[in-house]
Amino acid sequence: MNNLVDEGIAIPYSRLNFKFDAAKFYENYCADKSQYEIISVPSNMLFNISGSVVPKDFWKTPEQFASIAKAFAVMIDGKPVSTAFTSAKHDDKLEIGIETHKDYQGKGLAYLACAKLIEYCMDKKLEPVWSCRLENIGSVNLAKKLGFIETLRMPYYYIPK
C-alpha cells in the first residue's frame, strides 16, 4: 500500500472511536443556552441541511429518521446553523453526527447542539457514541470537550475516483 501512497493513488487516514465519560461531560459542561434558541428538529427539516455530515446520508427517509432518531439544532435568524443528530442507533447506543454551517464554525455552537443531544441520550438511558477521522481536528477536540475518551485508532486508505 505504501507504493500507492507514494504515487498519490491512495490517501492514508485514521478513524478514531471514542467512549463517553459522563463525569468528564459534566466536569467540562458549559452550555450557556440563554443567548441561543436550541430546538428539537423536525425530521422533514433535517433532510434540507447541506454539508459533509448530514442526516440524509445516514437515513433513507425523514419518516425512518423520525421513528428511530433525534436531532437538535442551534437556530439563528430562524435557520439551523449547527445540528447534532443521530447518525446511527443500535440497541442502547446512539452515534452522534454534527454539521455546522461554515459561517458559524468556531463559535461553540456545535458544542451546544451536541450537549443537548447528549442530555437527551442520558434522559433516555442511551449511550452517546462518537467517531471521526483523526485529521478532523475540530471533531476530535469537540469530542474531548464533550467528555469522550479515545478508545481505538484504525488506519485506513482512501482511493479517490
Task: Put a short name on every predicted segment.
Residues 63-71, 75-93, 97-102:
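A conserved beta-strand-loop-helix scaffold within acyl/acetyltransferase catalytic domains
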Residues 96, 106-121, 141-145:
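Conserved acetyl-CoA-binding loop-helix of GNAT-fold acetyltransferases
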Residues 10-20, 149-161:
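Conserved catalytic-core motifs of GNAT/GCN5-like acyltransferases
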Residues 2-3, 111, 134-152:
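Conserved active-site alpha-helix within GNAT-family acetyltransferase domains
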Residues 1-45:
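Acyl-donor-binding surface of acyltransferase catalytic domains
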Residues 121-133:
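Conserved GNAT acetyl-CoA-binding A-motif
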Residues 46-72:
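Short, conserved active-site entrance elements at the starts or edges of catalytic domains
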